Amino acid sequence: MAAKIYDAIVIGGGHAGVEAAFILSKKNFNVALISLNQNRLASMPCNPSIGGPAKGIITREIDALGGKQAYFADQAMIQIKMLNTSKGPAVRAIRAQIDKEKYSQIILKAVQETKNIDLIEDMVFEIQTKDNKISGVITEKNGLLETKTAIITAGTYLDSYILRGEEKYSSGPDGEKTSNSLSNSLIKLGFKLLRLKTGTPPRIYANSIDFSEVEEEILPESNLNFSIYHSKKLSKQIHCYLTYTSEKTHQIILDNINKSSMYSGLIKGIGPRYCPSVEDKIVRFKDKERHQIFFEPETIKADIMYINGLSTSMPIDVQDQMIKSINGLKNAKVAKYAYAIEYDAIDPLQLKKSLESKEIENLFFAGQINGTSGYEEAAGQGLLAGINASLKLENREALNLKRSDSYIGVLIDDLTTKGTKEPYRMLTSRAEYRLLLRNDNADIRLLKYAKYAKTLTDKEIATTEAKYDLITKKIAELENQYISINDPLAKKYNLANSTSFLQLISRHEIDIKEIVGNFPFLEELSTNVRLDGYIKKQLSQADKMLRLENLKLPEDLNYDNVVNLAFEARQKLKMIKPLTIGQASRISGINPADIQMLMFHLNLKVVKNEN
C-alpha cells in the first residue's frame, strides 16, 4: 500500500500552526499537524491574554479572513475591555484575559473533531527537499512523512535554552522539549538563523496574595467580543489587580544586577524592545520611582496569578527577595519562577510576502520562528501562510495583503522588506494608514481577499455585505433628509439654516444615537461621517503608494546592470528581491535616487523590448 502523501504538513502546534491547519482543512486539504505535546496546542507560556493595541485588531482581521483565534478567544475569555476609548477610533482595540487551560482544551477538541487534520505527537528532525522543492519531513517516531507543502511554525522551540541567573539548560517554554535537529536541518538547507530571547514573569498562588494592599480593577458588564461572525458575550468579568515595584525592589535588583542572565553576558540573543525585563526597566529608567505590576488570573479559577511587569532572568533566591518587596506579595508563594528563553529564528528577509521561502518552493514559515513576538502576530502569519499554501495547491496566485489593507499586511511587509534583529511586536504606530485599519471595519476591508481565497462561508459573506449596504444606505439617507428651522432639533442645536442630518451628526458634540436611534453599527457610522475628510486623505495617500505597488519588478532582474545604484542599495535589492517599486522604496538603505535609477532602468528596458 502506498504511503499517504499529505497536501500540507504543519510543524508546530502553537498559535500560528493551528491557524494554518484549520484554514487548510477548511479548504478540504488533508493536513498533518505535528506537535511536541498535543495537550499544549496554542499554549500561552507568557501572558494569558489576547488582543491589545494593534494586536486586538489583528485578531479581528484573522476572523475577517476566515481564521479561528477570535472565535476561540471568545469561548475562553474571562475578562474583556475596549482600550483607548478616550482616544480616536484608529487606536481603539479589544483586549481579553483568557482562561489559558480552557483555550488549549477547546482547540485540541476542535482539531480532533476535524476529519482532515491528523494530529501527530512527534518531533521533526529534518526537512526533505527534491529539486529545491519540499518533499517531506523526517520525524522521530513516524519516520518519513511525504507532503506537497509544509509550514514551519516552530515558535520558540528551536535549540532553545531556559536561563535564570547562572543556570542555563536546554528546554522549550514551560519545561517542554526543545528541537535542536530542525535548526541544523534549516542551516544545511542554507537558511540564515537569528538568535533571539524573550522571557516570562513569575506566577503566584492567589491565596498567598494580600489583596487589601493592591488596587482592584473593576470592569462593568460588557457585550464585547472578538468574532464578527460568532457572537458570544461574557456573563461575568473576572478582576485583575494593580500594584507597583518599591524602592526596596529597585535596590535588590541593582545590588544583584550582575546575577541576571541578561546582564552577566550569559544571554546572547536579542530581547524584545517593547517588553523589557524588570531589571532592564530599572537600569534604563533610574529616575522612575516605581513601575506598574499587574496581577492577572491565568484561568477562571483565578487560583494562580500571572505577575505582569516582573519578567526577569534573575536567580531564584533574588526573585524571592524581589517578589516579597512588592505590596501585596510579602507572603507570596511562588507557583512558577520567571525565566528567560533563548531560541533560533530565521531571518525573515529570506521569505516572499506570501511567507514562502525564496529558495525552497512550497515551504512556508509563520509565527515566532519569523522573528515576531505575540500570539496575535503568530496567528495572523499562520493564517496567511495556510491560505497561501492552499492557493499554491490550487495553482493560484498568492494572497499578498497591503499595508493599507490590514495590520497583518503591515507586519508581513515589515518582516520581508526590512527584516528584524529583535522580536518584532506590532504597534499602532507602525501603520501609516491606521485610520483605515480600525477595529470596527476589519470585515468590510478584508472581504474581497476572503472571497478570493474562498475562506468564508456564504452566510459570513452575506453578513458583511449586508452590514456594508446598511451603513452606505444610512449615510445616503441622512444626506438627503433635512431638518427645517422650525424643527425642535433646530432649536436645540441652534441651527440657523435648513441642515441635513448628515451635516448635523458630523458635529462631535451631537449625540448621534439621538438622531439615528439604535442603529446596529453606530461606531462605524459615526467614524465614517465625522472623520470623512481624514479618511479620504488617507485613502488618497494609500492610492499614491498603490501606484508604486503596481509597478512590478521582474523576479529575474539583474541589479548589477542598473547604472548609478548605490553599493548598499544594490546589495539590499539583490538579497531581498522586492516584488514592486513600492516594496523596494521601503527597504532600509534605499534612497529616492536609487528608486529613480531603478525606474529609469525599467523604462529603458521596456523601450528596448518594444523595438
Curated annotation (Swiss-Prot):
| Top-level lineage group | Bacteria
Gene Ontology annotations for the cellular component aspect, listed alphabetically: cytosol
SUPFAM superfamilies, from UniProt?
Answer: FAD/NAD(P)-binding domain (SSF51905)
Alphabetical UniProt keywords: Cytoplasm, FAD, Flavoprotein, NAD, tRNA processing
Among InterPro entries, the record links this protein to:
FAD/NAD-bd_sf, MnmG, MnmG-rel, MnmG-rel_CS, MnmG_C, MnmG_C_subdom, MnmG_C_subdom_sf, MnmG_N
Q: Where in the cell is it found?
A: Cytoplasm
- Signal peptide region: none
Q: Which Gene3D superfamilies does this UniProt record tie to the protein?
A: FAD/NAD(P)-binding domain (3.50.50.60), GidA associated domain, C-terminal subdomain (1.10.150.570)
Name a single GO biological process: tRNA methylation
- Cofactor(s), names only, from the UniProt record: FAD
**What positions does the entry give for NAD(+) binding?**
271-285
Q: How does it assemble?
A: Homodimer. Heterotetramer of two MnmE and two MnmG subunits.
* Free-text function comment from the UniProt entry: NAD-binding protein involved in the addition of a carboxymethylaminomethyl (cmnm) group at the wobble position (U34) of certain tRNAs, forming tRNA-cmnm(5)s(2)U34.
Annotated protein name in UniProt: tRNA uridine 5-carboxymethylaminomethyl modification enzyme MnmG
* Originating organism: Mycoplasma mobile (strain ATCC 43663 / 163K / NCTC 11711) (Mesomycoplasma mobile)
